[in-house]
Amino acid sequence: MSLIPRPERSPGALRAACAVVAPGLLSAYDRAKDRALAEAVEHGSLKPVHAYLAHWAALIEIERHPAVARRYHCAEYLARLATTPEEAREHLTTASALYREAATWSGQAVSS
């Protein structure tokens, strides 16, 4: 079950979705957008903007699904607490798998 429909992959739609599913991340979202726009101007390329939109679409996709968000944040937290590289790797593997799956789903045009 998702909290909200999948937003369009546009700055305004992603920010609005972030405000609902992860309001604590709004300042990070705004900083990332500003950084991507500055890099786009500096390099004369839209690649930084596309990367920022893809990254935030994946994060919003994770946050849209509370159970997935809990697993993702738990894995990141446990990786930070890990006492061995192997333990950290195990938790980061879980987090990265969830992120990759979310990135795949967030690239789809149809809301679910």
Regions found by a protein language model. Give the residues of each.
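Amphipathic alpha-helical interaction modules
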Residues: 25-69
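A structural signal for alpha-helix termini and helix-coil/disorder junctions
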Residues: 20, 35, 39, 62, ...
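Short terminal alpha-helical segments
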Residues: 1-38
